[in-house]
Amino acid sequence: MIRERKKSRHPRLPTLPLAAKASLYLFFACFSGLSLWSFHRDQPCTQNWIGLLGWSFSSFLLYFFGAAAFFIPLYFLWLSFLYFRRTPRPLFFYKAAAFLSLPFCSAILLSMLSPVGTLPALLDTRLPKFILGNNPPVSYVGGIPFYLFYEGQSFCLKHLIGSVGTALIFGFVMLFSVLYLCGGIALLKKKTFQDGVKKAFCSFFQTCFKNLKKLINRRNYLPKPSVPFVSKNPFSCTKSQPSPRRVSETIILDGSISPLPQEEIPGSKKESFFLTPHPCKRFLTKFVEPQENKAKEGKTIALSSTPTVVRESKGKERAALPKLKSLAVPENDLPQYHLLSKNREARPESLQAELERKALILKQTLTSFGIDADLGNICSGPTLAAFEVLPHSGVKVQKIKSLENDIALKLQASSIRIIAPIPGKAAVGIEIPTPFPQAVNFRDLLEDYQKTNRKLQIPLLLGKKANGDNLWADLATMPHLIIAGTTGSGKSVCINTIVMSMIMTTLPSEIKLVIIDPKKVELTGYSQLPHMLSPVITESREVYNALVWLVKEMESRYEILRYLGLRNIQAFNSRTRNKTIEASYDREIRETMPFMVGIIDELSDLLLSSSQDIETPIIRLAQMARAVGIHLILATQRPSREVITGLIKANFPSRISFKVSNKVNSQIIIDEPGAENLMGNGDMLVLLPSVFGTIRAQGAYICDEDINKVIQDLCSRFPTQYVIPSFHAFDDSDSDNSGEKDPLFAQAKTLILQTGNASTTFLQRKLKIGYARAASLIDQLEEARIIGPSEGAKPRQILIQNPLEG
């Protein structure tokens, strides 16, 4: 009843259909246009096409609006066009005001700037004479507004702000109206446009400052004569002092400096003249070798332009410019992020509205299941969006966790991840894929790292977290890393990102890499890097030798630290050298120890294909090599218990898991399920020892073209010097010394002869070695005619007797 009364009190007026409104505006446009076009002030009203009504209507419009009245028919025609097309009219009032302000301002500006003689004949004949009496026709162009605002006595802009100020005001009003009608205001509000304007201004001012600095330096470096003289050259500009000429920066050194011929020397013949030394001599002396003063008159120096000639007394000789060295690039000049390509993807403006809509759906879903909760922060990363849910008191966290599939259904998400609770917060986190995913460009991470003061020892620029923050890690504190993921999940791209992080932030003298690539195509492009300890290892028989060499290097470094009384590599590199103590050591002690990083791709394939036990040196390095700066990065497609054994897992606290096949593999690699629900293409879970729980992030991407650019740039800056050209030599020397037998061969032989059991699993259990090494020992015992060949399910026959029994 109340609603009906309200409706009856305020009845709605009937509205005209759109076609009727369009026709009405079209009629007004034709009426005003024909009446204005046929108006003539010297002709009677009967000559007007619309008659007396049209003549009076035109006089009224021209009297009040001046020349701007001719835009009124266009305004009605624009309205008719909008109604005919049924175009939506947001902010119609403001657009109409902007449309009408254009002719109004233009008429006033025309009245101010146009003299009487240059008025168009069309306007001069159509403006009424009785408007302002004997005033010149230029006043009529603006109509009454021009007379009131500019020429009148009550409010005269001409005397208040002058003609320039008036033109400035109305000109800016016209510019603002044009921008508003064309959508320029919305363009100005966009962040991309603002950033572009900022960059343009910054680059402009930087260019100005650089040019100003060059000009100042040019003036400072201009050579000045030590003694002024009078030139006899008739073509010289002044008689008292020669005009200084700019000396080119290009120098061709042929030897010492010689005096000019006597015929060309102005002044006395008893005086000698020498060329002014190059103005950048102070800079050049940093990169030149000192040379003995053996200047003779026969040698000359050539400059690219004519230098200033100065006079010196006889007997005084100026030292010749020394010979230039090959300018070496400073070691601290590393490749910058400018080499890499930019990320051209722009985040759409509708992302925030879409996330708010998702948040509303999430809250409604929780309410429908009887969960009272509020929503906290909404964070958006490159591929993920994270919502914070603040449950009320009495709500069980496990109840929210059990609604994972229902929430994914309501949000129409391919997969979600619920963090119950968020570590350090009284909230539950829900991560869903963002509706507008973006790739994480490695250039952005490198640019942020190079612009910050935070410097890591072995930086790993991995990607961006779910909230959009950068994910950086220091391998020196991790201290080893395992990367697992199926084919196409982003594992190989992550390895490339890790290698690029190290080579673009550290010098070749600070870090050395040992890369093992059984696939022979993924990482072989890094062989020419100056950071490499050896070329990329692709043969499985070299892998064991490389790992054994790293173990020996680890033991050698520990011996040096023990001798010097130091605890780790950081103390060694920052020590004060005592050359007397270090010289008494039996081997040479270097000034610094570089970090060494071993990167092994496809660990599972190596464990199956290698005949030697590579698990033992890996475990030894993982247990002991941290203090001496040797670190390992392992990658595998199959994170099963046969590959990632208990000893490996215990010594690799830092792990990265991309999408895996099942929950069991996820449990093995990150100690919790969830990796099987990842989206792939760089979506990863990172487990760090310094952080409680896992971190979800999007891995960075770098293309092959950028990798090749960086490698070429590094090779041009630093020479490639391998410490070990190949590990084949180690294999040959070991085979010559040991007779191609395992060090445990004698122990395995004694054990088999004593027990009478010759099986691979028996040796693996008793000697505590891996399966591959135990199988290799069985093969060596068979070749030595100690045991017989395999006979299927039957045990092997022992061919010799135990010497103790005999």
From Swiss-Prot:
GO terms for cellular component: plasma membrane. This is DNA translocase FtsK. ATP binds at G488, S489, G490, K491, S492, V493. The keyword Thylakoid does not apply. Consists of an N-terminal domain, which is sufficient for the localization to the septal ring and is required for cell division, followed by a linker domain, and a C-terminal domain, which forms the translocation motor involved in chromosome segregation. The C-terminal domain can be further subdivided into alpha, beta and gamma subdomains. The alpha and beta subdomains form the DNA pump, and the gamma subdomain is a regulatory subdomain. Essential cell division protein that coordinates cell division and chromosome segregation. The N-terminus is involved in assembly of the cell-division machinery. The C-terminus functions as a DNA motor that moves dsDNA in an ATP-dependent manner towards the dif recombination site, which is located within the replication terminus region. Required for activation of the Xer recombinase, allowing activation of chromosome unlinking by recombination. Induction: During infection of human HEp-2 cells, it is strongly down-regulated by IFN-gamma cytokine. InterPro entries: FtsK/SpoIIIE/SftA, FtsK_4TM, FtsK_alpha, FtsK_dom, Ftsk_gamma, P-loop_NTPase, WH-like_DNA-bd_sf, WH_DNA-bd_sf. GO terms for molecular function: ATP binding; DNA binding. Residues 189-806 are cytoplasmic. It is found in: Cell inner membrane. Its main location: membrane. The chain crosses the membrane at residues 16-36, 64-84, 96-116, 130-150, 168-188. Keywords: ATP-binding, Cell cycle, Cell division, Cell inner membrane, Cell membrane, Chromosome partition, DNA-binding, Membrane, Nucleotide-binding, Transmembrane, Transmembrane helix. It is a multi-pass membrane protein. Homohexamer. Forms a ring that surrounds DNA. The gene is ftsK. It comes from Chlamydia pneumoniae (Chlamydophila pneumoniae). GO terms for biological process: cell division; chromosome segregation. Residues 468-667 form the FtsK domain. Belongs to the FtsK/SpoIIIE/SftA family.
